[in-house]
Amino acid sequence: MMAKWMSVAQVKDKIKESSAEEVTAGYLEVIEKSKINGYITVSDKALEQAKKIDVEGHEGPLAGVPIAIKDNISVVGLPNSCGSKILEGYVPPFNAHVIEKLLDAGAVILGKTNLDEFAMGSSTETSYYGPTANPWDLERVPGGSSGGSAAVVAAGEAPFALGSDTGGSVRCPAAFCGVVGLKPTYGAVSRYGVVAYANSLEQVGPLANNVEDIAILMDVIAGYDRRDSTSIDSKTEYQKALVDDVKGLKIGVPKEFFGEGIHPGVEKAVWNAIHKFESLGATRQEVSMPNINYALASYYIIAMSEASSNLARFDGTRYGFRANGENWHAMVSKTRAEGFGTEVKRRILLGTYALSAGYHDKYYLKALKVRTLVKQDFDKALSTVDLLMAPTMPNPAFRIGEKIEDPLTLYLSDVNTCPINLAGVPSVSVPCGFTDGLPVGLQIMGKPFDEPTVLRAAYTFEKNTDYHTKRPPEVA
């Protein structure tokens, strides 16, 4: 059997030794024996795609390299379920911008990964297709909403994957599964072809077993797209930033990210990581970001409000699941009642309430004002330091079913990740240790479009530690 957990460079070497078709077949064999329910759909065209790469001698940067795609990103010929019954049977007739870029680079799409329904969640438990298990402990969640993408990378079922991050949906599962996950600056990667949850917050982001593969993927998918009015051509060269050197780098540690309820093992691992940076020549100072305390409430009001608007389009009329009804109104009502899961309905209702005439100013408008204050906190802190560092998640992965019946507790999981989405800045989660045998993630945040500094710090940490080389015993 093919070796699991290969880097992109190792995959490319393996392709030279054998073929893209053989490498793809190896991953498909691993997926077939999976214990984690990481994929919703495995592509029946992956081998054909890989064989075509071999025959045509594609010379793109990802020629023949397999990749997994979160199932809210449109791929021609593959279902795009968003983990929801309401999109059952829907196959998009177009590719997302990031998929176009990947195919141009020669990547082979293995399949579509599991997620919280419409990317609304932090545990990948709300999927219509069942929960995904964490490869480190099959009774625990992988995080969410891109839990399938993180889990398949951690389990060796793909060398890397794409996810989307609205309030931590790439970084949370990266931390829980012990992989690297980047939320790029808002606008760095086109959202065209990504089914919208909260447009003003979300970004497509990569997950991989090492920082170098994150940079390789960003060099492919980032850049301007005229079909996404929020995309920006920053002309960033991500791989060139990967230098093993943090001497003189100023690190800010925001005390608000180490608040009440943080797991002692997580806190210890993160502080050990920060001290490691100091030993490598970086300097540290405490910073205060007082409005972070209001970020979670602001985030959920904004996200749910945008979701209630975005999800109005799913009614069974043109595509996806359709319930029977005696007239059009009855059909739409029944379709949405049966097609959406409990958590999605909850967020639609709360978002509609926040946008209603009597409460718009009290909730939605106030949340937007708080968002501005949070952004100002980041601007102020990052004017005095190069990077901010904190725990990605306040706790390690929790058990499947432990929090799903308590939405508020589940929402609180996003306390350290959602402020970054409100501010629109880049943030990467890297493995920095373990507690109770479960991975811990260090979150490194930077100035807008300063992914090079963020990735340089992450790369240096990786080069001087071995946490990213650890593999889950459950699937080894």
UniProtKB/Swiss-Prot annotation:
GO CC annotations on file: glutamyl-tRNA(Gln) amidotransferase complex
Record has Protein biosynthesis as a keyword: yes
Top-level division of the source organism's lineage: Archaea
InterPro entries given in the database record: Amidase, Amidase_CS, Amidase_dom, AS_sf, GatA
Catalyses which reaction(s): L-glutamyl-tRNA(Gln) + L-glutamine + ATP + H2O = L-glutaminyl-tRNA(Gln) + L-glutamate + ADP + phosphate + H(+)
Residues of the signal peptide: none
Protein name: Glutamyl-tRNA(Gln) amidotransferase subunit A
Organism: Methanosarcina acetivorans (strain ATCC 35395 / DSM 2834 / JCM 12185 / C2A)
